[in-house]
Structures are given as C-alpha cells and as structure tokens.
C-alpha cells in the first residue's frame, strides 16, 4: 500500500449513478457522463462497473494511506468526490479534500494560477509527509 495517494479528478463510481452528477454535468465543459461511461466500459472489459476496481467507493477503504483528493467544483465528478470525502471521514481515514472552486475537470493540468497553488500544496505534502 502506498503511504500517500493523490487523486486528481478521479472517477470514484464508474456507474455514474449519482443523480447529482447530472446537475454538475451541465456546468462541466470537459466531462460528460455518457462519453465517460462509454470509455470506462471499454477500460473495464469484463469487470462490472460497480466492482471496487472500477468504482473505488465500493471497496474496502480500511488500510489506505493518506489521501489527497482534488476536484473542481464545476465538474461532473464533484458530487462523488464530496461523498467519498464524507466516507473517509466516517471511517477516520486521514485525507485532505482540496476543492478547486469554480474550476473544471483536471484543472491542475492547465496553466492557470490555481494549478500553481495546488502544486505548492502537493509539494508540501510530499516533502513534509503531512496533510
């Protein structure tokens, strides 16, 4: 198990069944549910989409290392990220949830000021091994 897991705009539930996701999809300029689900189905092959290997939210979270999770508040995946953060809290799993306010899918990969702020936070986490 890695000591620290960094998740940037992750698909946490490959079924995309969270009804809140449809609301956020309308604001997400990059990620649509139907196209995403199609790609996830190709990637999954014979693995069911609700299997923890495809939908980590369905797996056993105990024993995971520290988790840093960032997701834009304007992306389709935001509702599941919030739900996942609550699940981690309920199980007392150390994590840091970094919402990218008014930002889009995989925002830390784009040359915008918020990217630099996230990378500075990430560097601090890696260097100090603190949340």
Regions found by a protein language model. Give the residues of each.
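Alpha/beta-hydrolase superfamily serine-hydrolase fold, recognizing
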Residues: 1-131
């Amino acid at each position: 198990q890695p000591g620290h897991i960094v998740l940037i705009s992750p698909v946490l539930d490959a079924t995309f069944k969270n009804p809140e996701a449809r609301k956020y999809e309308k604001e997400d300029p990059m990620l649509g549910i139907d196209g995403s689900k199609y790609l996830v189905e190709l990637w999954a092959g014979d693995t069911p989409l609700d299997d923890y290997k495809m939908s980590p939210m369905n797996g056993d979270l105990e024993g995971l290392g520290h988790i840093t999770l960032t997701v834009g508040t304007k992306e389709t995946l935001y509702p599941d990220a919030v739900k996942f953060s609550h699940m981690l809290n309920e199980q007392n799993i150390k994590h840091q949830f970094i919402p990218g306010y008014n930002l889009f899918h995989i925002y830390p990969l784009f040359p915008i000021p918020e990217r630099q702020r996230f990378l500075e936070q990430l560097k601090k986490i890696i260097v100090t091994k603190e949340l």
